[in-house]
Design a protein with these regions (language model features):
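Conserved PLP-enzyme active-site core in the AAT-like
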Residues: 1-39, 99-103, 112, 116-117, ...
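Gly-rich Lys/Arg/Thr-decorated short loops/hinges at beta-loop-alpha junctions or inter-strand turns
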Residues: 48-50, 74-80, 107-111, 192-193, ...
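Conserved N-terminal alpha-helix of the aminotransferase class I/II PLP-enzyme fold
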Residues: 208, 253-294, 299
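Short acidic-aromatic active-site loops that bind/stabilize oxyanions
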Residues: 85, 202, 262-274, 293, ...
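Conserved C-terminal alpha-helix-loop-beta "cap" of PLP-dependent enzymes
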Residues: 33, 79-182, 213, 219-224, ...
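Active-site nucleophile and cofactor-binding loops and adjacent substrate-binding regions
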Residues: 233, 290-298, 323-327, 407, ...
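Flexible inter-domain linker/hinge segments
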Residues: 157-232, 236-244, 249-255
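Structural motif of enzymes handling amino- and sulfur-group chemistry
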Residues: 36-107, 468-499
Length: 499
C-alpha cells in the first residue's frame, strides 16, 4: 500500500455524461487501410483545448497503476478472480463464526471482506489493542468501542490463527487452532452478481507465466521508451528513472506500509518525508511544504485553496479573480475555476513574454478583487520572463498573491528559485523535475511549497485532527513515490542538480 499510494481508482458513468468525464479516453478506430487502430478519443475537454472549462483537473492519470491492475485481471481471468474472491470471503465467514463463538458479535449485515465486532461489556477495545500490538497486528478501532478487520488475498491460515488468538486471549477462552478454512458464503441471493464479467478475449487467454510474459512484450514493442530513444514531451523535462532510485520501491518496508498505521510504526517513512520536505524548501526558497497533492493540477488546486484561506483570514475573502497569461498551461485556468475563482487573461507577445502594459492595466482594473497571478516560470514557450521580479511587485501592490507554476522548475534548480523572484506559492512536479516515473500518465506527485505567511493554511488531514484544505484521502499523497525523489536529490547533490 506504499503508506498511502500511488494507486488507481475507477468510475463509470452513463453515456449522456461522457463528455464531462475527466481524463483522456482511448478509443478504437480504423486507419485509411481499414485496419483496427487505437487513438485518443473524447479529449476535447482537456485543458489545452477547453482551458477554464476543462474537467480533467479533478483527477490525475494513474496509467501505470491501472496497467498493473489490468495485467492482474488478465493473468487471473474471470475464474481466477472469482476463486480469489471466494477464498477471501470464506476466511471472513470463518472468522465471523469463530469469533462470535468466543462471545463477540459481528454486526455487519452484509459483507464481503470486512468485519466489525461489538465487544462484550467485560472486554475493552484497549485490551484487544494491547494484545494485537504484542502480536504485531493492527486492527481498526471504532469510536463506539467496536473492533474491525479486513481480509484480503494475503491473509493466510497463520494470520487467521493469530486473529483468533487475539480475541480468545482477551475473552479468557480456549480456542482451537485452525488448519484450513472451508469454502463458505454469507452473501444473500439478492446481492450476488448475475451478469457476466471479464468477457473480452484478452482476459481469457494468458494464464501462464510464459503466455503473460510474451503478451506484455508484444505490447512493449509498440511503445517508445528510454530503451529506444529520448522521449519528446514538450517543455516538461523528464529524468531517467535510475535503478538506484527505483530500488526502494521493491522493499517490503516501503511497499507494505498501511497509511493509517500508528505513527510509531512509520518512523522511517516520517523521517524520509521530513527530510525531503526540508530539501524542497531549500530548493524553492520557501518556508513550508505539503506533499499531499497527487499531481501538478492537484498542486495548483491546493495552492489556490491555500491562497483563498489566507485571504479570508485577513478579511479579503471577496477577492475572487485570478490573472493568467495567455501563454499559461491550460491547467492554470482550469484549476482556478475548480477552486472557485474567475479568470482574467493577460496578453503575451509573439515570443511568449507577458505583455507588461496589459498586465499593469488588468491588475489595476481588477485590483480590488484580484486574488492572485498564476504564472509559469520559465513559460511553456521556454521563456524566462526578464521582468518577473517587477511582475511579482505589481501583483503584490494590488494586495494579491503570486502563484508560480513549477512545471518547468528543472530550468531553475540551483540557479534561482520561486522565493527569490518574489512568488508566494508554487507546485512542483516530482515526475518531471525530480525523477519519479511518469508511467505513460502517472503516478504523479505535485507538492506545494509556500512562503512563511501561507504555512498555517497548508493542507491538513483528519488523521492529524485538522482537515482544513485537505485535497487527498491520504495524509502524504502518493508517499510510495517519495523515496525516488529523495534518492535522486541526495545522490545528485547541489552541484549535480544545478548542472
Amino acid at each position: 500500500m506504499f503508506y498511502s499510494g500511488p494507486s488507481a481508482a475507477y468510475f463509470a458513468t452513463r453515456d449522456e455524461y461522457k463528455r464531462n468525464m475527466p481524463g483522456r479516453i482511448i478509443g478504437w478506430s480504423k486507419d485509411k487501410y481499414g485496419k483496427l487502430c487505437y487513438r485518443m478519443a473524447l479529449q476535447t475537454r482537456e485543458q489545452h483545448i477547453k482551458r477554464e472549462k476543462a474537467t480533467s483537473n479533478i483527477c490525475t492519470a494513474q496509467a501505470l497503476l491501472a496497467t498493473m491492475a489490468g495485467f492482474y485481471a488478465v493473468y487471473h481471468g474471470p475464474e481466477g478472480i472469482r476463486t480469489i474472491a471466494e477464498r477471501i470471503h470464506s476466511i471472513a465467514v470463518f472468522l465471523e463464526e469463530s469469533i462470535n463463538r468466543l462471545g463477540y458479535k459481528q454486526v455487519n449485515a452484509q459483507y464481503f471482506d470486512t468485519l466489525r465486532f461489538a465487544l462484550p461489556d467485560t472486554i475493552s477495545a484497549q485490551q484487544i489493542r494491547t494484545i494485537a500490538l504484542s502480536k504485531e497486528v493492527n486492527l481498526r478501532y471504532f469510536k463506539n468501542g467496536d473492533v474491525g478487520m479486513s481480509i484480503d488475498e494475503t491473509t493466510d491460515i497463520t494470520a487467521v490463527n493469530v486473529l483468533l488468538s487475539i480475541f480468545a486471549i482477551a475473552a479468557g477462552r480456549d480456542w482451537e487452532k485452525a488448519s484450513d478454512v472451508p469454502m463458505a458464503s454469507s452473501i444473500s441471493a439478492e446481492m450476488k452478481r448475475q451478469s457476466t464479467y471479464l468477457t473480452h478475449e484478452v482476459f481469457n487467454k494468458y494464464h501462464t507465466e510464459t503466455e503473460m510474459m510474451r503478451y506484455i512484450k508484444r505490447l512493449n514493442r509498440k511503445d517508445i521508451s528510454l530503451a529506444h530513444s529520448m522521449i519528446s514531451l514538450g517543455s516538461c523535462t523528464m529524468k531517467l528513472n535510475a535503478a538506484a532510485e527505483m530500488l526502494p520501491l521493491s522493499r517490503p518496508e516501503f511497499m507494505n506500509m498501511h497509511p493509517l498505521v500508528p505513527e510509531d510504526q512509520a518512523e522511517g517513512y516520517r523521517e524520509l518525508i521530513s527530510n525531503l520536505s526540508e530539501e524542497l524548501k531549500i530548493i524553492t526558497g520557501f518556508a513550508g511544504v505539503s506533499l499531499q497533492p497527487n499531481s501538478g493540477a492537484a498542486g495548483e488546486y491546493a495552492g489556490l485553496r491555500v491562497i483563498r484561506a489566507y485571504l479570508e483570514s485577513i478579511g479579503q475573502g471577496h477577492r475572487n479573480k485570478i490573472l493568467i497569461p495567455a501563454s499559461a498551461h491550460g491547467t492554470n485556468p482550469a484549476s482556478a475555476i475548480q477552486a472557485g475563482f474567475t479568470t482574467v487573461t493577460c496578453a503575451c507577445d509573439a515570443q511568449g513574454n507577458v505583455d507588461m502594459a496589459d498586465l499593469r492595466a488588468k491588475a489595476e482594473e481588477n485590483k480590488d478583487d484580484l486574488a492572485a497571478l498564476m504564472i509559469t516560470y520559465p513559460s511553456t514557450h521556454g521563456i524566462f520572463e526578464t521582468e518577473i521580479v517587477e511582475i511579482c511587485h505589481i501583483i503584490h501592490a494590488c494586495g494579491a498573491q503570486v502563484y508560480m507554476d513549477g512545471a518547468n522548475m528543472n530550468a531553475q534548480v540551483g540557479l534561482t528559485n520561486p522565493g527569490f523572484i518574489g512568488a508566494d506559492v508554487c507546485h512542483l512536479n516530482l515526475h518531471k523535475t525530480f525523477a519519479s516515473p511518469h508511467g505513460g500518465g502517472g503516478p504523479g506527485v505535485g507538492p506545494i511549497c509556500v512562503a512563511e505567511h501561507l504555512v498555517p493554511f497548508l493542507p491538513g488531514h483528519k488523521l492529524f485532527g485538522n482537515a482544513a484544505n485537505q485535497v487527498s484521502g491520504a495524509p502524504f499523497g502518493s508517499a510510495g513515490i517519495l523515496p525516488i525523489t529523495y534518492g535522486y536529490i541526495r545522490m545528485m547533490g547541489t552541484e549535480g542538480l544545478t548542472r
